[in-house]
Amino acid sequence: MDFEEMMKELEEIVNRLESEDLSLEESIELFQRGVELYKKCREILQKEQLKIIDVLKELEGDEDDAGRNQEDES
């Protein structure tokens, strides 16, 4: 299941918990599933955030190298 599918299911769970008259057992099961999905989504987002940080560091390094090359040519 990918991130978007998990988010969609999580939204559906929230909507059901907010709008339906559920038994305590059903509510707890849905809540537990929601927490599970939340943790997986958070993990994915944290991994993607690290990738973005790495890309930005590479970009900064490229800009620093380009600046040094221009200084060397002067």
Swiss-Prot record:
Keywords: Cytoplasm, Exonuclease, Hydrolase, Nuclease
Assembly with partners or alone: Heterooligomer composed of large and small subunits.
GO terms for MF: exodeoxyribonuclease VII activity
Protein known as: Exodeoxyribonuclease 7 small subunit
Keyword Metal-binding: no
Family, as annotated: Belongs to the XseB family.
Enzyme class, broadest EC rank: hydrolase
Catalytic activity: Exonucleolytic cleavage in either 5'- to 3'- or 3'- to 5'-direction to yield nucleoside 5'-phosphates
Organism annotation: Thermotoga neapolitana (strain ATCC 49049 / DSM 4359 / NBRC 107923 / NS-E)
Subcellular location field: Cytoplasm
Role summary: Bidirectionally degrades single-stranded DNA into large acid-insoluble oligonucleotides, which are then degraded further into small acid-soluble oligonucleotides.
Domain of life: Bacteria
